[in-house]
């Protein structure tokens, strides 16, 4: 089992969360909420308003999201779902626990896989950086789900 940290459309209440609940993809168990220990730019970009965590450690904000424990089957599914390694790259990062279910305490640090990208348009660096993502957020950039494209 591995920990993954999701910050965008895979979070609870977001457009793609349903794939985390589909056991045909493997197992994913919610473990808590956290934030990246290092700062990163979280931007919303492209014609479909996709959230992207740019792999630029030290720039942007500590990003909040959710921590899941996943099995190997779900990890492989998510790699495919996130078009890894072409669109996103699966990166191991330290995540500080904000709220935890079960063993563990707030303030602890957990190593998680996170889908980041090092391949992006240069103008993305000038987009607003977000601390957290909500498809319905005040940014007004509603995500366009895959099934609508």
UniProtKB/Swiss-Prot annotation:
The keyword Electron transport does not apply. CDD domains: GGCT_like. Substrate binds at residues 7-10. It is an enzyme of class 4 (lyase). It comes from the Eukaryota. Keywords: Lyase. GO terms for biological process: modified amino acid catabolic process. One of its GO terms (molecular function) is gamma-glutamylaminecyclotransferase activity. It catalyses: epsilon-(gamma-L-glutamyl)-L-lysine = 5-oxo-L-proline + L-lysine. InterPro entries: AIG2-like_dom, GGACT, GGCT-like, GGCT-like_sf. Its EC number is 4.3.2.8. It holds the Pfam family GGACT. The active site is at 82 (proton acceptor). Contributes to degradation of proteins cross-linked by transglutaminases by degrading the cross-link between a lysine and a glutamic acid residue. Catalyzes the formation of 5-oxo-L-proline from L-gamma-glutamyl-L-epsilon-lysine. Inactive with L-gamma-glutamyl-alpha-amino acid substrates such as L-gamma-glutamyl-L-alpha-cysteine and L-gamma-glutamyl-L-alpha-alanine. Belongs to the gamma-glutamylcyclotransferase family. Monomer. This is Gamma-glutamylaminecyclotransferase. It comes from Mus musculus (Mouse).
């Amino acid at each position: 089992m591995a920990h993954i940290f999701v910050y965008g459309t895979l979070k609870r209440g977001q457009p793609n969360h349903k794939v985390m609940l589909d056991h045909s993809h493997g197992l994913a168990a919610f473990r808590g909420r956290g934030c990246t220990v290092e700062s990163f730019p979280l931007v919303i970009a492209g014609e479909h308003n996709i959230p992207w965590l740019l792999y630029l450690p030290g720039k942007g904000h500590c990003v909040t999201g959710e921590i899941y424990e996943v099995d190997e089957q779900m990890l492989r599914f998510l790699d495919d779902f996130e078009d890894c390694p072409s669109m996103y790259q699966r990166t191991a990062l330290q995540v500080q626990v904000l709220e935890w279910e079960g063993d563990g305490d707030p303030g602890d640090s957990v190593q998680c896989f996170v889908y980041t990208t090092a391949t992006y348009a240069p103008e993305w660096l000038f987009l607003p950086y977000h601390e957290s993502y909500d498809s319905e957020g005040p940014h007004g950039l509603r995500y366009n789900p895959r099934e609508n494209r």
